[in-house]
């Protein structure tokens, strides 16, 4: 008895029964937070977690003594016992309602054990056998068939028990044990005790009280214990366990359970079975109701389904195509492999595919162990060499034959189509509202692969900020690997330049560029602190330059990324432009090309080579061009640093004038821009031809490079060190202009590769190219060949967009972004669709960048001379123009024509800024010029008698949509085109290398140009200043200062592939693709205008005019078939009537060769 009492007291003083029963699980667990491994809930104490785990395992160690009810927690059992006690009090002395089902209970176990003499006889006999009242209660419990662990309420009467102790005196008077009162009958004594004293005695011990609440508290505090399988002392009250332990043991941990469903629920913890998977995102759950709740996330949004949409709400677009809301739940048909990006239709095929990766990893681990093994014998090697074979081990080491390697076309990070599949078609972007040119720092850490969901997800900005706040000691591995304290590799002066990997490695570290210094690797909380810190490195570079360190740095090969000026992460911010001397267009191109290891041009024209850690080399350049150019451009770079305080926003990148220090970069870009967007290329220094770039903007004569064809560009490159040469059979075909196919070491390979390429010659001139699309662009722009009937196959058949996408609020709408490798620079939004071929006279002055494309530049009678200079003559040098685009500087032989053409164009250019002039509608690159609803009106609608034939036609856009714009208007260009020049021989005579205009050009093209000229004449008829234009060579210098544009760019520009791509950033070719869309020349506006017509109208495919009757359209089409006569050799002169173009005859009266022929209206 004493031992049982002491055990109960120990249980009360010690830890809770749950902790005592599971003491081996919590020993040494000092964690402040305890997390459930099933549902993820956290608890501050281990005991709370243990009680919570009973919900998952189903264990209920607490059992009610009156019924079969079980409870997992002690408090729940207390509530249950109180319900039994309340029922007992209501029923008075009758047996408790909960006792009826228990057959093993006897009379002594009720609250009224001594209610009758027959019942009390057996009970009292046991008490008389030499036991006290306290021990008698235990004997009663031990002799009964009830379980020893049960808790019972004992409401007995002291007087009844005292009187029952005399067996032979049943008829004698009974006495109350509390007040010593005597009663003749036992029922009277029981009534007295119940009414006067109400005693409540504990059956498990000698505790007795007059208050039932005290007895209940005593039982709950001392006698309620858990019946767990691992706690024998707590479960057994008097040495008799309730259940035989280990009926259903766990095979993993050995824990035993009383029921099978306890064991089944327990086994889920060991095998971690997620049997219920989501078919949309791939997440898996253990329980079906978890999956049911998860599926609500993929269902339609109930809140936004009935809510009216406002105009400010962004509309979901994918590539500027408005996506309608889909109410049905999406279904994913693909599973993405996290290692190689392959897509699979189900999870089984993905698991089978993952076995390949596991085998490859296992083979890599076995490879070092097998290195010590001997190779094949000499006889075997000789035999393999005779058969031109090699051992399989050597083949396995090649990356091209590795099993399960990453497929670039199926990689969701690099492939546009796979990115759309991996994102499940969701409207998402890698980063939110990327700045122009700052996509690579926003991309860092934005895309991650979620293993649970098996898809690529976007990392939130908050997570990136938390990662950026990490201490600098825990920085990214690439900065730790190339820190200042690391030993410098051989052949490099800068210890950071050799072991610096490409910037794509920063994407896995979660650290953005904005808070990390490229020079020393320090991490700052804000971007502004990093900018202030970068000035220290810039000051140090200036000191090194002043000490004459530039020659040594040039002799080292090139500047590394660390030696460059502090390149900010956002060229569009003011701080970026102020703190970076090269934060303009050239630096943005350097940022883009440096993504994959391409060189980055220095601000002073010094080329940089990106040195990879695995490609360390000690090769030095033998030429002295680097030091020569660095010495010549030192003052220019300092000047550029002082002038770089302008905010390098998008508009400034397009419209502001370029600094003098960037001219050599632009000349270098003229050779670099033919590289593929994401192709790593080797550094080639700028050719040291002694070319100088004067700071003046006049048309001084310069000795330029000889004209080159596309194949001649390879002769200008030098062999760049720092690249390991691949095996000849593994070297990929390099189609770039900067390839090394003409390297002396690769003469045999270069000759075979170059011979294998198909050369596409131009049928109208001597231009040749390896690319058919380049030839198509050349014929379209240079020779004005109409492509109405033959459109290139890569152009979309219909570029018409929904009118909803033209709304203003869609400018910042949510849209599905490109794959992360493109960095937010996929095909940019197409220009707004044009509703007609012209604009009203009110739409021109607002356009700052102009609307005349490159194809409409001034080409006077010297057009064949341009062709000759294109094929064999000296080319024009590229230099930055005042309007922000690269322009040409004329050579010696071309200066007279530039002077001759600049005179007639000076005054119209002046009036274009003060008076509205009709111009071709919205086609160029002017992002600010948006079509207004009034552009549907016809041009030249003023009531004049001489302009009636002109009103029937719209002015067609005469240029290609992928060329930069110029400030002068299209009518002035056309007037100069139709005019004759007094200087120089006739165009078709004496220019043997230039054929006449192509015969394939339909006569409708000349008709359109004539109508354009006539429209301009009708629109500016009353202008007296136009009629009194100055002479050819006598243009006043004031007019030249208004718009400083060398007009020679119009008729001296070589429109081959080199000149086409000169105006593009290396990776911003999306603008070129944009030109092949709605506003592109390949569509010829045929599909656009036809789709814009109302139902029942017939649209002319030549000019876009619509008619209600087909007969009217046929009559109108005869006007396009008019044949213009020419006077033989001067085939480029188009003759107009004096009634249609009276102003032109007066304007060009000094040329003297204009003939007019009446235009037959009936044809």
From Swiss-Prot:
KW Electron transport (keyword) present: no
Protein name per Swiss-Prot or TrEMBL: Zinc finger protein 516
Zinc finger map (C2H2-type): 34-56, 62-84, 174-197, 200-223, 248-270, 276-298, 335-357, 515-537, 760-783, 1098-1120
Main subcellular localisation: nucleus
InterPro entries, per database record: Krueppel_C2H2-ZF, Znf_C2H2_sf, Znf_C2H2_type
Lineage: Eukaryota, Metazoa, Chordata, Craniata, Vertebrata
GN (gene name): ZNF516
Entries under PANTHER family matching the protein: ZINC FINGER PROTEIN (PTHR45925), ZINC FINGER PROTEIN 516 (PTHR45925:SF3)
Pfam family, one: zf-C2H2
One Gene Ontology MF term: DNA-binding transcription factor activity, RNA polymerase II-specific
Localization per record: Nucleus
GO terms (BP aspect): adipose tissue development; brown fat cell differentiation; positive regulation of cold-induced thermogenesis; positive regulation of DNA-templated transcription; regulation of DNA-templated transcription; response to cold
Family annotation (SMART domains): ZnF_C2H2 (SM00355)
Cross-link type Glycyl lysine isopeptide (Lys-Gly) (interchain with G-Cter in SUMO2), residue numbers: 643, 681, 1043, 1062
């Amino acid at each position: 008895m004493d031992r049982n009492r002491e055990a109960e007291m120990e249980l009360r003083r010690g830890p809770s029964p749950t902790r005592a029963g599971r003491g081996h699980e919590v020993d040494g667990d000092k964690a402040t937070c305890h997390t459930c491994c099933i549902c993820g809930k956290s608890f501050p104490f281990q005991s709370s977690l243990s009680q919570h785990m009973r919900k998952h395992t189903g264990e209920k160690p607490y059992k009610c003594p009156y019924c079969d009810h079980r409870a997992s927690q002690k408090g729940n059992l207390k509530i249950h016992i109180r319900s039994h006690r309340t029922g007992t009090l209501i029923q008075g002395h009758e047996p408790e309602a909960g006792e009826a089902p228990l057959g093993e209970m006897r009379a002594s176990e009720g609250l009224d054990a001594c209610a009758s003499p027959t019942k009390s006889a057996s009970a009292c006999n046991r008490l008389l056998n030499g036991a006290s009242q306290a021990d008698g209660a235990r004997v009663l419990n031990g002799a009964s068939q009830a379980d020893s662990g049960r808790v019972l309420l004992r409401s007995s009467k002291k007087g009844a028990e005292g009187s029952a102790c005399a067996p032979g005196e049943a008829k004698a008077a009974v006495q109350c044990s509390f007040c010593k009162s005597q009663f003749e009958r036992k029922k009277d004594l029981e009534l007295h005790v119940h009414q006067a004293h109400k005693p409540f005695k504990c059956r498990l011990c000698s505790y007795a009280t007059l208050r039932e609440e005290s007895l209940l508290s005593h039982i709950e505090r001392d006698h309620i214990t858990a019946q767990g399988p691992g706690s024998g002392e707590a479960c057994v009250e008097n040495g008799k366990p309730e259940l035989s332990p280990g009926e259903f043991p766990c095979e993993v941990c050995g824990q035993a359970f009383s029921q099978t469903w306890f064991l089944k629920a327990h086994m889920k913890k060991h095998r971690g079975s997620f049997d219920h998977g989501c078919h949309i995102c791939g997440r898996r759950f253990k329980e079906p109701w978890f999956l049911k709740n998860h599926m609500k996330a993929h269902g339609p949004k109930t809140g936004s389904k009935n809510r009216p949409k406002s105009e400010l709400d962004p509309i979901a677009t994918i590539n500027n195509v408005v996506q309608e809301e889909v109410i049905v739940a999406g279904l994913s048909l693909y599973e993405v492999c996290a290692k190689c990006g392959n897509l699979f239709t189900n999870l089984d095929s993905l698991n089978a595919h993952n076995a390949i990766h596991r085998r490859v990893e296992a083979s890599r681990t076995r490879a070092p162990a097998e290195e010590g093994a001997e190779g094949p014998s000499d006889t075997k090697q000789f035999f393999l060499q005779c058969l031109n074979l090699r051992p399989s081990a050597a083949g396995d080491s090649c990356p091209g034959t590795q099993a399960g390697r990453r497929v670039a076309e199926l990689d969701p990070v690099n492939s546009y189509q796979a990115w759309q599949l991996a994102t499940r078609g969701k409207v998402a972007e890698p980063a939110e509202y990327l700045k122009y040119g700052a996509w690579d720092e926003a991309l860092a850490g934005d895309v991650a692969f979620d293993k649970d969901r098996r898809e690529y997800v976007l990392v939130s900005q908050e997570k990136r900020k938390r990662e950026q706040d990490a201490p600098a000691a825990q920085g990214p591995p690439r900065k730790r690997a190339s820190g200042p304290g690391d030993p410098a590799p051989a052949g490099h002066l800068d210890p950071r330049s050799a072991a610096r990997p490409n910037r794509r490695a920063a994407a896995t570290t979660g650290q953005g560029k904005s808070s990390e210094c490229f020079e020393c690797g320090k991490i700052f909380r804000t971007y502004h602190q990093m900018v202030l810190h970068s000035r220290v490195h810039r000051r140090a570079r200036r000191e090194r330059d002043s000490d004459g360190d530039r020659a040594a740095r040039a002799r080292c090969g090139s500047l590394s990324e660390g030696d460059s000026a502090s390149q900010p992460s956002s060229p569009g911010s003011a701080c970026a432009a102020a703190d970076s001397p090269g934060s303009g267009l050239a630096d943005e191109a350097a940022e883009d090309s440096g993504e994959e290891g391409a060189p980055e041009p220095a601000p002073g024209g010094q080329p940089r080579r990106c040195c990879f850690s695995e490609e360390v080399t000690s090769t030095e350049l033998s030429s002295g061009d680097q030091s020569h150019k660095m010495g010549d451009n030192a003052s220019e770079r300092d000047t550029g640093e002082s002038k770089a305080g302008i905010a390098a926003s998008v508009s400034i990148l397009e419209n502001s004038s370029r600094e003098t220090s960037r001219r050599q970069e632009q000349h270098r870009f003229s050779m670099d821009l033919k590289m593929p967007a994401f192709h790593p290329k080797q550094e080639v220094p700028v050719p040291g031809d002694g070319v100088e770039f004067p700071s003046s903007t006049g048309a001084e004569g310069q000795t330029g490079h000889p004209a080159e064809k596309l194949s001649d560009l390879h002769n200008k490159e030098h062999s760049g060190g720092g690249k390991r040469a691949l095996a000849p059979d593994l070297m990929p075909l390099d189609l770039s202009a900067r390839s090394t196919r003409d390297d002396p070491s690769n003469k045999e390979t270069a000759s075979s590769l170059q011979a294998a390429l198909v050369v596409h010659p131009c049928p109208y001139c001597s231009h040749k190219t390896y690319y058919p699309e380049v030839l198509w662009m050349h014929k379209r722009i240079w020779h004005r060949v109409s492509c109405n009937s033959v459109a290139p196959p890569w152009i979309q058949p219909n570029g018409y967009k929904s009118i909803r996408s033209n709304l203003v609020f869609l400018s910042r709408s949510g849209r599905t972004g490109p794959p992360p490798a493109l960095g937010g620079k996929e095909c940019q939004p197409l220009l707004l669709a044009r509703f007609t071929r012209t604009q009203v006279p009110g739409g021109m002055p607002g356009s700052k960048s102009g609307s005349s494309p490159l194809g409409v530049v001034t080409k006077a009678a010297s057009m064949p001379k341009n062709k000759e200079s294109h094929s064999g003559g000296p080319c024009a040098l590229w230099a930055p123009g005042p309007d922000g685009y690269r322009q040409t500087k004329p050579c010696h032989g071309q200066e007279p024509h530039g002077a001759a053409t600049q005179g007639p164009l000076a005054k119209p250019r002046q009036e274009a800024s003060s008076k509205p002039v009709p111009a071709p509608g919205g086609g160029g690159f002017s992002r600010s010029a948006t079509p207004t609803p009034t552009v549907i009106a016809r041009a030249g609608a003023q009531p004049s008698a001489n302009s009636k034939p002109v009103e029937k036609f719209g002015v067609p856009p005469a240029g290609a949509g992928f060329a930069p714009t110029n400030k002068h208007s299209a009518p002035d260009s056309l007037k100069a085109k139709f005019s004759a020049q007094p200087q120089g021989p006739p165009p078709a005579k004496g220019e043997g290398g230039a054929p006449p205009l192509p015969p394939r050009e339909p006569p409708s093209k000349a008709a359109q140009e004539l109508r354009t000229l006539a429209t301009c004449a009708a629109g500016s008829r009353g202008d007296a200043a136009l009629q009194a234009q100055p002479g050819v060579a006598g243009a006043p210098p004031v007019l030249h200062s208004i718009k400083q544009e060398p007009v020679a760019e119009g008729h001296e520009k070589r429109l081959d592939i080199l000149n086409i791509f000169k105006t593009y950033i290396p990776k911003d070719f999306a603008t070129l693709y944009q030109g092949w869309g709605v506003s592109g020349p390949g569509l010829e506006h045929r599909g656009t205008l036809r789709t814009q017509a109302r139902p029942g109208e017939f649209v002319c495919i030549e000019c876009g005019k619509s008619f209600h009757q087909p007969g009217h359209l046929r009559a109108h089409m005869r006007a396009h078939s008019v044949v213009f006569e020419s006077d033989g050799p001067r085939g480029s002169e188009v003759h107009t009537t004096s009634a249609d173009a009276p102003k032109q005859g007066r304007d060009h009266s000094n040329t003297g060769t204009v003939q007019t022929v009446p235009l037959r209206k009936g044809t």
